[in-house]
Amino acid sequence: MPRLQQKWLNSRECPTPRGEAAKGLFPTKDDPSAHKRVSPSDKDIFILCCKLGIALLCLGLLGEVAVRARRALTLDSFNSSSVQDYNLNNSENSTFLLRQGPQPTSSYKPHRFCPSEIEIRMLAKNYIFTNKTNPIGRLLVTMLRNESLSFSTIFTQIQKLEMGIENRKRRSTSIEEQVQGLLTTGLEVKKGKKSVFVKIGDRWWQPGTYRGPYIYRPTDAPLPYTGRYDLNWDRWVTVNGYKVLYRSLPFRERLARARPPWCMLSQEEKDDMKQQVHDYIYLGTGMHFWGKIFHTKEGTVAGLIEHYSAKTYGMSYYE
């Protein structure tokens, strides 16, 4: 036997993991029924299908029980007479809420109440009838009008709104705590309606708005519209008495402060500007300093003419 063939036979005889794993899958001379034993029989498949069917049936029954229990609880907690009163009431609120906008064809049933609809109306009764400007009430009105959102979405939004309202209340009650905390610093503290003020220098500051000891002097007071530049070469303006960098203003504010509008000038300033224009047009006076910067041929000729005419007619300031 050739050497290569001998080597091939030896390699076939030595056991490999792949060969060991595939031992029971194929019929061999020693075990002809191996493949029949591994594959499941029809009986096994039938039992598995039965188990799956029973499990699905149990899940469906559990879901149905949960839905019925929830519906029963909802109806118990909300007595049906008030539902009818709410529905048939001709007051401003009920007409404002109900039968406006398209009704959904799939979920809405005229002859019976959906639990979610009852819950929405309960919430609407709580929120809207007490205060129409309540954001939660407005949200519910929107929802009842177009019914585009699911009740769970609405409910999470209501929870968020309620949390926001609670936070607002908490923040307003914590002013006293802020005052107590700031009093320990030794500064003079004043309590406002919505916040606390601390006296630094001769001015009152909200905590966190103090930007360093810049002093208002008559020369340094920034122009209200165009602003000034501070020591860091940042342009700044005063907003409600605070130093605000020009770049941190919103776009419309920056646009409004680009130049002082005409209406902000006093009547004397307006008249003075008109007089300057009038003098320049009719008398040729004023704005002579530009001649020191821009020298043009036409300007020189005009200056000479003006000079000689002034000597003749005496309409210049030179005499």
UniProtKB/Swiss-Prot annotation:
Residues 1-44 are cytoplasmic. It is found in: Membrane. The chain crosses the membrane at residues 45-65. Its main location: membrane. Glycans are attached at residues 79, 89, 93, 131, 146. InterPro entries: MMTV_SAg. The keyword rRNA-binding does not apply. It is a single-pass type II membrane protein. The keyword NAD does not apply. Residues 66-319 are extracellular. Residues 1-39 are annotated as: Disordered. GO terms for cellular component: membrane. Signal peptide: none annotated. Residues 28-39 have a biased composition (Basic and acidic residues). Keywords: Glycoprotein, Membrane, Signal-anchor, Superantigen, Transmembrane, Transmembrane helix. It comes from the Viruses. Belongs to the mouse mammary tumor virus PR73 superantigen family. Superantigen. This protein is coded in the long terminal repeat (LTR). This is Protein PR73. It comes from Mouse mammary tumor virus (strain C3H). The gene is sag.
